[in-house]
Curated annotation (Swiss-Prot):
The active site is at E265 (proton acceptor), C299 (nucleophile). Keywords: Mitochondrion, NAD, Oxidoreductase, RNA-binding, Transit peptide. The record marks N166 as: Transition state stabilizer. The lineage of its organism: Eukaryota, Discoba, Euglenozoa, Kinetoplastea, Metakinetoplastina. GO terms for biological process: ethanol catabolic process. The gene is ALDH2. One of its GO terms (molecular function) is RNA binding. It comes from Leishmania tarentolae (Sauroleishmania tarentolae). Belongs to the aldehyde dehydrogenase family. NAD(+) binds at G242, S243, T244, A245, V246, G247. Pfam families: Aldedh. This is Aldehyde dehydrogenase, mitochondrial.
Length: 498
């Protein structure tokens, strides 16, 4: 996700336009109920928008529009869909500074990160999936006798997509780009904490020339909008990114209604293994960036760090120095590299975990406290003396907190790393290619990074093992998430009987 280096620092432009309505059938409209909800800047706790609140009636209208649009959009030429998505990518890139400023305001992340990571990778996702649009190939399996068999892939239909608050624009791009490229239509619900960039993206989709109803965007709450999408009998597929607990609920709702297709990208408690031969300066930088990037609100954050006992003290010293050097503050202030947590609820949750860790007997190496009286800021935090049955070691905190533990033997530490309900990501810092290749195979995670972390590329699949999810985003594998195979059997009418 994070590029090797961020572009030069620059001031975030002032946000001058915020779309506050729902997008249904090509028009921006208020909610049927007339309800709105407040969107708060997590850096200063001030209200920045009052956004229309979608509920069941709005979901019904959006699904109806998506179903109607699907009947024609599914039959469109794949090269036309490719060019349409390339146009959308160009529009997003042209407006990248505006979108980054809006994301920073909405989510709290540093403007430079929003610009060079969230927006830049979103553009790449749209361009990559545009390239897939005309490369979805069927097959002609061998058949016995005078028969012909063709297997083709076709779009699933109306796709519900529920987007998280940690990467609002980027996660929308992860899901929206393959869905539209394959010829599906979409009802998308952004997180209630961070709806602004998704709705602005909807304006760009309309500007690019997508037909009415192909994309519908419904800001709202999970209980009254997200659950209605997941339960809707005319939604064919649901894609969700968020916590494992809510993922269970989404899957249950899909099963209890029309057995709609489900793809889930869920939680993680990712382990980073620092080997005895690792470059400790590099390893400490990898760990620092990946623990505190996006204020730790990343499902792949290296929140469990296992360090060989021979280099443990030096590594912890380097990690502490790096953590204490982080510049924490509002995302739109130049030079800050860690913003606030996204909401009051998340702020209280993270501080609660830190308090629980202290009570359980873990040692705070650095950090552990909130910062200031305004905004949802928490110090970068490191725990040592952690036992693996502690909540801070087992549960996903989703904040700038990590646990650093010793190990003696690689086989032993891989077992410890795998002892989790999660399997989203893992990492190894080592100078040995043999070690990297061997143990990356043994780690039960959908992604393993070696001497790096959160290094995403649209051509590589992303998803989790175990309770970290079902299915994959990105890569060629994403085609399977938004198409269905159809077998067609032909009997020859020119069979000559003896």
């Amino acid at each position: 996700m994070l590029r090797a280096t961020l572009a030069r620092l620059e001031m975030a432009p002032k946000v001058t336009h915020i779309q506050e309505k729902l997008l249904i059938n090509g028009k921006f409209v208020p909610a049927v109920s007339g309800k709105t909800f407040e969107v708060v800047n997590p850096a200063d706790e001030k209200v920045i928008a009052n956004v229309a609140e979608a509920e069941k009636a709005d979901v019904d209208l959006a699904v109806k529009a998506a179903r109607h649009a699907f009947e024609s959009f599914r039959m469109t030429d794949c090269q036309w869909r490719r060019n349409l998505m390339l146009r959308l990518a160009d529009i997003l890139e042209k407006n990248s500074k505006e979108m980054a400023a809006l994301e920073s305001l909405d989510n709290g992340k540093p403007y430079e990160v929003a610009l060079n990571v969230d927006v830049a990778l979103s553009v790449e996702c749209f361009r990559y999936c545009a390239g897939l649009a005309d490369k979805v190939n069927g097959t002609v399996p061998p058949r016995s006798g005078n028969f012909l068999g063709i297997v083709k892939r076709q779009p699933i239909g109306v796709c519900g997509q529920i987007i998280p608050w940690n990467f609002p624009l980027l996660m929308a791009a992860f899901k929206l780009s393959p869905a539209l490229a394959m010829g599906n239509t979409v009802v998308l619900k952004p997180a209630e904490q961070t709806p602004l960039t998704a709705v602005r993206l909807g304006e760009m989709v309309m500007e690019a020339g997508y037909p009415d109803g192909v994309l519908n965007i419904l800001p709202g709450f999970g209980a009254t909008a997200g659950s209605e999408i997941a339960r809707h009998m005319d939604v064919d597929k649901i894609a969700f990114t968020g916590s494992t607990a809510v993922g269970h609920q989404v899957m249950q709702m899909a099963a209890e209604t029309n057995l709609k297709k489900v793809s889930l990208e869920l939680g993680g408690k990712s382990a980073l293994i620092v080997c005895e031969d690792a470059d400790l300066e590099e390893a400490a930088e990898v760990a620092t960036t990946r623990v505190y990037f996006n204020t730790g609100q990343v499902c792949t954050a290296s929140s469990r760090i296992y360090v060989h006992e021979s280099v443990y003290d030096e590594f912890v010293s380097r990690l502490r120095k790096n953590a204490e050097a982080r510049k924490v503050g509002p995302g739109n202030d130049t030079g800050n590299n860690m913003g606030p947590l996204v909401s009051k609820k998340q702020h209280e949750r993270v501080l609660g975990y830190i308090e629980d860790g202290v009570k359980a007997g873990a040692t705070v190496v650095t950090g552990g406290k909130k910062i200031g009286d305004k905004g949802y800021f928490v110090q970068p935090t490191i725990f040592s003396d952690v036992k693996e049955d502690m909540r801070i070691c087992k549960e996903e905190i989703f904040g700038p907190v990590t646990c650093v533990m010793k190990y003696k033997d690689m086989d032993e530490v891989v077992k410890r790393a795998n002892d989790s309900i999660y399997g989203l990501a893992a990492g190894i810092c080592t100078r040995s290619m043999d070690t990297a290749l061997r143990y990356s195979t043994y780690l039960n995670a959908g992604t393993v990074w070696v001497n790096t972390w959160n290094n995403f590329c649209p051509s590589m699949p992303f998803g989790g093992f175990k309770q970290s999810g079902i299915g994959r985003e990105l890569g060629k594998e994403v085609v399977d998430m938004y198409t269905e195979p159809k077998a067609i059997h032909f009997a020859s009418r020119s069979i000559v009987k003896p």
